[in-house]
Amino acid sequence: QERGNAYCFMNVGKYLERILQSIDFLNVKVDSLKTMNNNLNESYFWKNLLVSIGGYQLYIKTYKSIFSVDNIIELISLNEFFPRSIKFSLNKLYTHIMRLEKFNKPHENNLNFMAGKLRNQLKYSNLASIKKQGLKNFAYEIQLQLNDISNEINKVYFYQISS
């Protein structure tokens, strides 16, 4: 049983916001890490970050090691089982955009293409490609594409031409 448009719109908004929050969290925390100079503070810092986004238990189960910046970036960006990760949220966003399209059948719609393109870009990303591109550039590129998706949602579903 499908829940309808309202449920899909609510989830599109939820996952758009969740992706942006995860990106912001990652950017802010990695920037503030540069001011730290002691391993005890750093370890405490990473634990608090993971607890605050609900990822501490998953991190411990997945990596079974001391805190590593690479592992944390991978968890928050690329883990498809962590509900606060960019990849998980993007997959959910894509699912709900597809459902909206099924319910509404809009005439001109690049939304499916745009969301699918971003989803595949992240699907074929790994930690090495993120590091090569730079975390800031990686995050900025995703934010730009999410803004385009958001604008397309407004254009397709909310923009009314008065005649």
Per-region residue spans from a language model:
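Alpha-helical transmembrane segments and their helix-helix packing motifs
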Residues: 1-163
